[in-house]
């Protein structure tokens, strides 16, 4: 990214609106091929026929401008600006160009903010999705109610573009972005709005991911403001926030008005013990106070989505539960607050008393049924959890087959090592181990028992169960007692940045 900052500063110095000219820069598309963006959609299978031409990109952009979008006719669905070219490839290239360009100012701003806050060294640990669980273990045992929230998707891509317009002042760039989205919707006019946005997210993952993340960031920034000023808000006062520009321009004035003019009529709900966590499109809001406050926030969320983002969400999509009686699902774990009872003997002079102490602990367990469902979908077992052979891998060498199974088992063990109960984790390892043996036996056209007896592979396959112990022994080489204690306790690895396909079964 640093090697392109010189070009960006040059383009920025020439004119105020600097995003639009980047569309026609060769190095922007070269950036998509660099190692920094190796997750690009069109990088994976780049052959001779798929080598892009900047001249063709310019021609396609010109064609989008030349179409008259003010006149809608029956033949509009037949018009295709990508006619004569590789439609999917150049659609992805232009989408990738939009994504890269719009990421640049936010990436530079984010990098500078990290350096200013002096948290660059700890940034890698903060990025881990498992860094949230130590926070939950520390805070949630003292809370009583949890609200399970699924953030709704916008019904139209235009909503995502409008949100971004308030932060990036470049009218030509967004006009071209709208033309691109219009052409996409025009080519998929047979789809409903909900299916259309789902199709766009699959065919243009990078651009959609950026727009959606920005939408979530915007929603959370408004929520944090409401949380900070919650003692001055009532549900019937929410109508003053309808106009979004007015909201940002006058929010400080509104707070002063609330405090001065409505202090005698407002009902104050102060809740210092309220916590909010989110991963992807799901969030958890937990509080210690009565469910009345949680219901208040529930209606705030619904009105926020409807008024600011034109997203319809029914009250039934937000579930309020009691932590001691219900569990919530987050990042592949089921979590709930469990009561631990212990009896302490106390003696005073000649009298002995038994004192019962009740403490709360956050219980985090592996959801065995969803994982077995994911393993069955990947053809490692059937729906009942009985291991089966992975026939599609039978053409590989024995070493490759064992290595593939070991990597899957290692990743799942690494991810779920924070579980309170390891019995479910051992069952998953057993399924993968037996599936590996059956795959090898299928390859050699033998039974499982005959294959193990002939090849002596039983000791090699013990790695499925010894991998975790070897890692812990490297961390604590001399403390065997410590190793035994840690073997039954939770360990969170802060190098996990995302969940794999078998874990992501929502």
UniProtKB/Swiss-Prot annotation:
One of its GO terms (cellular component) is chloroplast. Transmembrane segments: none annotated. It is found in: Plastid, Chloroplast. Keywords: Chloroplast, mRNA processing, Plastid, RNA-binding, tRNA processing. It holds the Pfam family MatK_N. One of its GO terms (molecular function) is RNA binding. This is Maturase K. It comes from Mimosa pudica (Sensitive plant).
């Amino acid at each position: 990214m640093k090697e392109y900052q010189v070009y960006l500063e040059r383009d920025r110095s020439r004119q105020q609106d600097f995003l639009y000219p980047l569309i026609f820069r060769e190095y922007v598309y070269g950036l998509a091929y660099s190692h920094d963006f190796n997750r690009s959609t069109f990088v994976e299978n780049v052959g001779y026929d798929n080598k892009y031409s900047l001249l063709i990109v310019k021609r396609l952009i010109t064609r989008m401008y030349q179409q008259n979008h003010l006149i809608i006719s029956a033949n509009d669905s037949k018009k295709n600006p990508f006619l004569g070219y590789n439609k999917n490839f150049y659609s992805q290239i232009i989408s990738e160009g939009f994504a890269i360009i719009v990421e640049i100012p936010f990436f530079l701003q984010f990098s500078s903010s990290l350096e200013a806050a002096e948290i660059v060294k700890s940034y890698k640990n903060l990025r881990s999705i498992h860094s949230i669980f130590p926070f939950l273990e520390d805070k949630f045992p003292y809370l009583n109610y949890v609200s399970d929230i699924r953030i709704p998707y916008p019904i139209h891509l235009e909503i995502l573009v409008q949100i971004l317009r308030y932060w990036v002042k470049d009218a030509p760039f967004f006009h071209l972005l709208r033309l691109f989205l219009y052409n996409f919707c025009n080519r998929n006019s047979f789809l409903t709005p909900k299916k259309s946005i789902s199709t766009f997210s699959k065919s243009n993952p990078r651009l959609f991911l950026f727009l959606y993340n920005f939408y979530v960031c915007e929603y959370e920034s408004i929520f944090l403001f409401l949380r900070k000023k919650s003692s001055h808000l009532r549900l019937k006062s929410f109508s003053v926030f309808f106009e979004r520009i007015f909201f940002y321009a006058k929010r400080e004035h509104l707070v002063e008005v609330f405090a001065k003019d409505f202090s005698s009529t407002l009902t104050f709900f102060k809740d210092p013990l309220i916590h909010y966590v989110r991963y992807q499109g799901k969030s958890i809001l937990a509080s210690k106070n009565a469910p009345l406050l949680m219901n208040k926030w529930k209606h705030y969320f619904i009105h926020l989505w409807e008024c600011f983002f034109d997203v319809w969400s029914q009250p039934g999509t937000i579930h309020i539960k009691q932590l001691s009686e219900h569990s919530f699902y987050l990042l592949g774990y089921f979590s709930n607050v469990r009561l631990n009872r212990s009896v302490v003997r106390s003696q005073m002079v000649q009298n002995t008393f038994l004192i019962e102490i009740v403490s709360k602990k956050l219980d985090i367990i592996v959801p065995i049924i969803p994982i077995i469902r994911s393993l069955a979908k990947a053809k490692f077992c059937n729906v009942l959890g009985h291991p089966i052979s992975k026939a599609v891998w039978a053409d590989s060498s024995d070493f490759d087959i064992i290595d593939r199974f070991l990597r899957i088992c290692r990743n799942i063990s690494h991810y779920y090592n924070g579980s309170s109960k390891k019995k479910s984790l051992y069952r998953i390892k057993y399924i993968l181990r037996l599936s590996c043996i059956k795959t090898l036996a299928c390859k050699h056209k033998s039974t499982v028992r005959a294959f193990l007896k002939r090849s002596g592979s039983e000791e090699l396959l013990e790695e499925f169960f010894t991998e975790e112990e070897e890692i812990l022994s490297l961390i604590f080489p001399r403390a065997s007692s410590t190793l035994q204690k840690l073997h039954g306790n939770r360990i969170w690895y802060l190098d996990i940045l995302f969940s794999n396909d078998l874990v992501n079964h929502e």
